[in-house]
Structures are given as C-alpha cells and as structure tokens.
C-alpha cells in the first residue's frame, strides 16, 4: 500500500485547492523541487504531481517546475494535467517521469489511452475525477454524462497501470476519502485503484489497512500532510506494518 504525497503546481508554486477551484489556492511552498526532496527525505517512495494550469489549458504549463522536481528527487514521479497527446506522453517519459496520468483525454479519446498503453507499457495511468458520481473533465470545469465505473471498464485489458480516482466534492477539504465509492470501483475493475480527495487524518491511513481496502494500490495525500494533520513517519509505519506504528 503506497501513500503518495501530492504536489499541485499553479504558476510554478506548490499549492492546494478546495474542490478544484483555482480561486481557493493556498500556497504551501514556492519551491516545488525543495518540497519534492523533503517528501523523499521523509521516507515517501513515490510522488504525485499535477500541473493545475495545464489541466485547465489543455497543455503543459509548469514544465520548468516539473523538470526541477525530476532533478531534485530520486523517487518515481507520476504527472497529470494537460497531457493530451502521444507526443507529450513520450516527451515526459523521456524526461524521466515514471508514469503519466491521462484524464480528460480518457473521456474524449479512449483509443488514445489504449495506444499509449501499448506504446509505453506500465507507464500510463488514468485519472477519473468525479462529482456526484459523474466524471468531470477539463480541470474539473466540465461535467460529463459518464459514470465512474462505466469509464473505468472501457480500459479493462488495455494495460492501464492504475486508476487515480478523485472525489471532487471531498478534494482539499479534509472530510475523509469516499471509501464506499473508491472500494466499489476497485471491486468493479481489475486495474489497480489509487484513492484521492479528502484524506484527512491517521484514521484514513488506518482505514487503508482494512481487508476491504486491500485491492487499492494506495492513496494520495495533500493538504493533510502540509497542515501537519498526518505525521509522515507514523503513516508510513502503519502502512508498512512496522512495530513503531501507533495504535
């Protein structure tokens, strides 16, 4: 079970939003590369990065910041936000990304996702962001008519490395992960699922260790880490089943 610390990039800075609304951005670090290294030093083994400007614009915007992150950390990095073409995917993977996350294009052009999975095995994840059970696109600014499981099932057997499932209503507001919807998705498909949106406390970390959550690959944490609501050492000890984990 992996805990992915999150770096969301807006105008070259590390920020957190509430419900995906750019107007609610709180700046946590103006040096994303330093933040990436700090997460590595705390013991995390992966890094989740989102180009927020890119998600809204439909093309990579914070490329310089992502490049600096890749140089600063030895941890594998997954990136989403504004990645729409095979050429972009190839470019980012050549620059050192461990995997790319395709969101809007997974709805608009699912065949491109399948092509990407064939071209770059194990390097392509799908981001499914939902509000009220329906998939949202274009930086969460537009709603679609697609259901979460309906979209996920389109990629069964395609070679998708993981599905990152975000409940927009819970994102950035520390209300706890939508465990019911997340576990329902994990049980509906064979693709590994990563939970995102709302992780709030050590209680959520403990919840990740429960038997019904074992189909998950992990969860993403942003604001709870930045605000100190989750202690990295304690969280990682719990997930790794180490004796020093607190009950």
UniProtKB/Swiss-Prot annotation:
Signal peptide: none
GO terms for biological process, alphabetical: L-histidine biosynthetic process; L-tryptophan biosynthetic process
Single annotated GO MF: 1-(5-phosphoribosyl)-5-[(5-phosphoribosylamino)methylideneamino]imidazole-4-carboxamide isomerase activity
Compartments where located: Cytoplasm
Pathway stated in the Swiss-Prot or TrEMBL entry: Amino-acid biosynthesis; L-histidine biosynthesis; L-histidine from 5-phospho-alpha-D-ribose 1-diphosphate: step 4/9
Keywords, alphabetical: Amino-acid biosynthesis, Cytoplasm, Histidine biosynthesis, Isomerase
Active site: 8, 129
Catalytic activity: 1-(5-phospho-beta-D-ribosyl)-5-[(5-phospho-beta-D-ribosylamino)methylideneamino]imidazole-4-carboxamide = 5-[(5-phospho-1-deoxy-D-ribulos-1-ylimino)methylamino]-1-(5-phospho-beta-D-ribosyl)imidazole-4-carboxamide
Protein known as: 1-(5-phosphoribosyl)-5-[(5-phosphoribosylamino)methylideneamino] imidazole-4-carboxamide isomerase
Organism (species): Mesorhizobium japonicum (strain LMG 29417 / CECT 9101 / MAFF 303099)
